[in-house]
Amino acid sequence: MPKVGIIFNDDKPTACSVAQELQEQLQQSGFTVAMETGSGGLLGYSQPDRPICHTRIEHLTPPHFDESMPFAIVLGGDGTVLSAFRQLAPLGIPLLTINTGHMGFLTEIYLNQLPTAIEQLINGDYQIESRSMMTVRLMREENLLWEALSLNEMVLHREPLTSMCHFEIQVGYHASVDIAADGIIVSTPTGSTAYSLSAGGPVVTPDVPVFQLAPICPHSLASRALVFSDLEPVTIFPATPNRMVLVVDGNGGCYVLPEDRVHLSKSPYPAKFIRLQTPEFFRILREKLGWGLPHIAKPTSVELP
């Protein structure tokens, strides 16, 4: 029998109950179903007085999931989707993402669309959209201390109650630049609608092969977001005496010391989204973030006295 998977947010009763119902439905349709919670993809935070908690990228793959799976289903919000791709992107499994959370910017459908969606899924009536991911590595001399896959962004910022930071940043083999700021964000196109957007970065459509660097509260009028090819690796050298905090996808990370460096590159593992209709990014921007909506109602759209 073909094998498929379900990853769900076990902190949400709705996701748990729907996961159980889906498991039974898929088993009745002739599938073997592997179940896993989204917590398996959580990175966790390293404490400053303890050794760095390092889990290799390939070691996040849950048991009983493998490359033979034609698809897996994710039940949760955006955090669960990010966690699921950290777990399954190395296996190349396409994911149908179902929103049981709040905004669900990365999810494909809502629960009320589930019956039709499962029918399409079983019949193979869908497209696959591939989105680039980023590999984040923390190096000390030549030693790998920590690594993670990122679908959204890497953030390197100062600790609370410390002063502004300086960063030496080298993109590809170009001359390095110095940025003075509270922190920096390096994001994928998918992450351009997340933290980077709040920091003043532009929205980048998912099909554009770029990375984006955005400073957080820079101390210069000349420091602005930069968009560059994702074929260019990025190396960040902390040029400040204080330790910093590295966070990936708002989920977890570790402390970065002045002698460390952060290396970013395009991941060989894409995130494969199952699309039940033709992807329309601008519709999602309008629906989820209110992009392009009029600020003032037009006379023809309101009832005039």
From Swiss-Prot:
Gene3D superfamilies: Probable inorganic polyphosphate/atp-NAD kinase, domain 1, Probable inorganic polyphosphate/atp-NAD kinase, domain 2. Its cofactor is a divalent metal cation. Keywords: ATP-binding, Cytoplasm, Kinase, NAD, NADP, Nucleotide-binding, Transferase. Pfam families: NAD_kinase, NAD_kinase_C. It catalyses: NAD(+) + ATP = ADP + NADP(+) + H(+). The keyword Cell inner membrane does not apply. Its EC number is 2.7.1.23. Its main location: cytoplasm. NAD(+) binds at residues 78-79, 152-153, 182, 193-198, 251. Transmembrane segments: none annotated. GO terms for biological process: NAD metabolic process; NADP biosynthetic process. InterPro entries: ATP-NAD_kinase_N (IPR017438), ATP-NAD_kinase_PpnK-typ_C (IPR017437), NAD/diacylglycerol_kinase_sf (IPR016064), NADK (IPR002504). The keyword Nucleotide-binding applies. NADK activity derived from sll1415 makes probably a larger contribution to total cellular NADK activity than activity derived from slr0400. Slr0400 cannot functionally replace sll1415 under photoheterotrophic conditions. This is NAD kinase 2. It comes from Synechocystis sp. (strain ATCC 27184 / PCC 6803 / Kazusa). The lineage of its organism: Bacteria, Bacillati, Cyanobacteriota, Cyanophyceae, Synechococcales.
